[in-house]
Amino acid sequence: NQFDILLCSNLFGDIISDECAVITGSIGMLPSASFNEKNFGLYEPAGGSAPDIAGKNIANPIAQILSLSMLVRYGMKLKKIADKIDKSVASALKAGYRTADISNNNSYLKTNEMGDVISDFLINGK
């Protein structure tokens, strides 16, 4: 809760992202951004490609959605929209919606269902 941004080289970023995954409960919760000197950014989830779960509809979409929020906030300078995206993710989690990687029971959503829930919070402000 103390830090919003960690600045480090790629090697240490890989190590730190693995450590942060333990803190958050899943690598699927970690957005990331890489910038160059001209402020051009690459926004993507902190984890790898996870080929073992590709096409199974079980990946946690939150890191991707929060990476989009970072793109909107830092790349497009649209803070209010980024805040709405962040709030939608937080609202979905607060309401108890979870994907399998962060669920502590047998009730969880698939990737597309979690995306739909977060979209619903974003569009309808639920």
UniProtKB/Swiss-Prot annotation:
<dbReference type="InterPro" id="IPR019818">
    <property type="entry name" value="IsoCit/isopropylmalate_DH_CS"/>
</dbReference>
<protein>
    <recommendedName>
        <fullName>3-isopropylmalate dehydrogenase</fullName>
        <ecNumber>1.1.1.85</ecNumber>
    </recommendedName>
</protein>
<keyword id="KW-0028">Amino-acid biosynthesis</keyword>
<dbReference type="GO" id="GO:0003862">
    <property type="term" value="F:3-isopropylmalate dehydrogenase activity"/>
</dbReference>
<feature type="binding site">
    <location>
        <position position="18"/>
    </location>
    <ligand>
        <name>Mg(2+)</name>
    </ligand>
</feature>
<keyword id="KW-0464">Manganese</keyword>
<dbReference type="Pfam" id="PF00180">
    <property type="entry name" value="Iso_dh"/>
</dbReference>
<dbReference type="InterPro" id="IPR004429">
    <property type="entry name" value="Isopropylmalate_DH"/>
</dbReference>
<keyword id="KW-0560">Oxidoreductase</keyword>
<keyword id="KW-0520">NAD</keyword>
<dbReference type="GO" id="GO:0000287">
    <property type="term" value="F:magnesium ion binding"/>
</dbReference>
<keyword id="KW-0479">Metal-binding</keyword>
<keyword id="KW-0100">Branched-chain amino acid biosynthesis</keyword>
<keyword id="KW-0432">Leucine biosynthesis</keyword>
<dbReference type="GO" id="GO:0005829">
    <property type="term" value="C:cytosol"/>
</dbReference>
<comment type="pathway">
    <text>Amino-acid biosynthesis; L-leucine biosynthesis; L-leucine from 3-methyl-2-oxobutanoate: step 3/4.</text>
</comment>
<comment type="function">
    <text>Catalyzes the oxidation of 3-carboxy-2-hydroxy-4-methylpentanoate (3-isopropylmalate) to 3-carboxy-4-methyl-2-oxopentanoate. The product decarboxylates to 4-methyl-2 oxopentanoate.</text>
</comment>
<dbReference type="GO" id="GO:0009098">
    <property type="term" value="P:L-leucine biosynthetic process"/>
</dbReference>
<keyword id="KW-0460">Magnesium</keyword>
<keyword id="KW-0963">Cytoplasm</keyword>
<comment type="subunit">
    <text>Homodimer.</text>
</comment>
<dbReference type="InterPro" id="IPR024084">
    <property type="entry name" value="IsoPropMal-DH-like_dom"/>
</dbReference>
<dbReference type="GO" id="GO:0051287">
    <property type="term" value="F:NAD binding"/>
</dbReference>
<comment type="similarity">
    <text>Belongs to the isocitrate and isopropylmalate dehydrogenases family. LeuB type 1 subfamily.</text>
</comment>
<feature type="binding site">
    <location>
        <begin position="48"/>
        <end position="60"/>
    </location>
    <ligand>
        <name>NAD(+)</name>
    </ligand>
</feature>
<feature type="binding site">
    <location>
        <position position="14"/>
    </location>
    <ligand>
        <name>Mg(2+)</name>
    </ligand>
</feature>
